[in-house]
Amino acid sequence: MKTVEIFISGRVQKVGFRACVKRIATELNVTGTVRNLPGGRVHVYATGELMILEKFVSMVYGCPRVLIRDLRQSEIPLKKFDDFSIIKREGVSVQGFKFTAVS
């Protein structure tokens, strides 16, 4: 298991990108979070097997209405998540539960 931190820029906000990322993560059994950042970027934590994470990143490029101009990823210390959540604002997921990343 590995965790990657991903920063994505381009036309990635207000186009359904976070929902698309969550759908792909759920299909691939990847856990983590996705959230919008100030300045129009998106931040993702993704945890899974290396081959699956590579597929996850490649599938993200196929989200409709999205134009990815830059995607930077780096491996970070393992973070464990129960599922994959869209973070609406700092510390609160779509379901309204506070997320806690365990490292």
Task: Briefly describe each language-model feature range.
Residues 1-103:
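Intrinsically disordered, low-complexity, mixed-charge
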